[in-house]
Amino acid sequence: MKARLTVLGSGTSMGVPTIGCDCAVCHSPDPHDRRTRPSILIEYAGKSVLIDTTPDFREQAIREGIRHLDAVLYTHGHADHILGLDDVRPLSFHRPEKIPLYARPVDAELLRRMFRYIFDADYKFGGLAQVELHTIDGPVDLFGVRFEPVKVIHGDAEILGFRFGQAAYLTDVSEIPEESYSLLTGLDILFLDALRHKPHPTHSTVENSLRIVERVKPKRTFFTHICHDLPHEATNATLPPQVRLSYDGLKLEFEI
C-alpha cells in the first residue's frame, strides 16, 4: 500500500529560530532553516496518523492543510511532543468517534494530569477536544497498518520510536538498545535524531547518527530534531548522498 509522509516539524525543542538568538541560522533567509518542533503525519488509504502533537501543531496543520485526523501516536511526554494536544480540537468536532491517542502508560498518565480538563469527567467545559487515551503495550494496528514500537534511549529515559511498513521514525535518541536493531532491518526510509555536532547528554550527534546509519543501512535517511548549529545547505554538502537533513514540509512517498 502506498503512503505519504509529511514532516510537520524538524526542529529541536526550542525550535529554529530560537528565542533571543542572533546566530546566522536563526536569521537565515533559507526556509529550510526554519524548523518547528518535531512531528510527522502519515497518510494512507484515506486515513491520517500523527506522531506527536507539538506546541507548533496549529501552525503546522494550517501550513499543510490538514483537514482530518484519525489517530495520534506519542513517542514520549516531553513538552515539545505533547503540548499541542488541545489544538486537535477542530479536527475532532465533526467525527462520529473520538480521535484515539496512543501512549505508553507513563505518558498517558502525564497527559491526563496536564490536560485534566479534557479527560476528567468532572470538568463540564464545552468545546473540549474529543479524544480518547489508549496505552501502548505492543504493536498498534491502525487501519490495516502495524505501528511497531521501537524502544530507544533518550538520556536516562527509555522512550519510543515507531516502525511502520518500510519506514521508521526515531526522534529524541541518544542511543539505540541492541535489541531494537532487529526492528530496523530492510528500511526504505529512516528518520533519526541528529541534533548537532557537539555531544549532548540526551540527543545523538551527526557523527553518532552516521554510525547508526552505517549499521542499519536504510536506503534513505533523514536527520531530524535539528538545532540551530546545523545550517541546512552547508550541512547537507558534508553528508553522504543517501543521508539528508529533513525540513518542515518535506513529503515522501513510500510503501507501508
Residue map of PLM features:
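Binuclear metal-dependent hydrolase catalytic cores
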Residues: M1-L170, N236-E255
